[in-house]
């Protein structure tokens, strides 16, 4: 049997589509466990209505304690030998669970992993890890599972919801996750779980639809973000420290930590600086005039930081998908606007993208537009190469 666990918290408008997609699964024997994590909308009633109509549905109502506790609660109730997680505001293709379970049966793998569609109102993006489809002995991929060596690429994607787990291996991994973790909950499960496997199966199949909700992303920022990120990194460091492969795992974790703080709290790199900021970029004068290129997670992190400093002037914020971000209430413009901005109107153009491959393409485009190459800045090579730049803080 397969247990599909769905943590639910105030997702009433999305939940029916999620549940319907699961109940239409083509695989034979499965149960759906809905864990209502103290919802205050109509989610509890929706869960109960499905339980009344379908014997495969199990509903648990509990007080709000977060995603980690909700997953633990669902796992404790699960009767299946295999576990799949689905978020309550997402949905899956009808053959997803069957595909993953067949892969595990055919290969004898301890984990089956696939990709997902990241969907917003205006775009759909396919997301996979870097590893090609195939069967891997775990020892083969440990050195690149979290970081391939190119900033920033995952070897195996972090998403728990695109994977099928063995319950007996998942139990200890999930139960020991620090309940305080509410950032990177998937990372806290996926990679510690892989350490317990012998063989994993990577599929190029995509059957999971991750839905990005409407609304301004820039506004979604908590003052305790840095502390929450530190809890996650410290938790993973403790696990990796005890592994026989600690050296290569910690090296990857360091790179992941850099990426995490770049995209969520870039200010942490400048704690001891006075005359310059953005040390990952090699240092930018505190009174500089900046054009920001990139409005994804890293761009939003950087924009928040710069707008919070009175001495910095953000001349413009650019992204080729500006129309998408404008609908979310963000003041982002098309890169073509650069042609109207005089060279003397700004000091630096900062590329706020965490993909080394994408940066190379952006550099070429900017140079073709006549942007002064000396003004274009991205992460300095020393910052990317340094193996223990971040983890020294978690000694």
Regions from the PLM with identified roles:
Residues 83:
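Short aromatic/hydrophobic "clamp" motif used to bind/position activated sugar donors
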Residues 29-38, 58-63, 87-88:
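Short beta-strand/loop segment that forms part of the nucleotide-sugar
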Residues 20-29:
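Short, acidic, metal-binding catalytic loop of nucleotide-sugar glycosyltransferases
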Residues 262-395:
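Hydrophobic, well-ordered beta-alpha structural blocks that scaffold small-molecule cofactor pockets
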Residues 88-203, 208-224:
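Donor-binding/catalytic cores of nucleotide-activated saccharide
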Residues 21, 36-45:
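A conserved acidic beta->alpha catalytic loop
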Residues 62-78:
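Glycine-rich, basic loop-to-helix element that forms the pyrophosphate-binding segment
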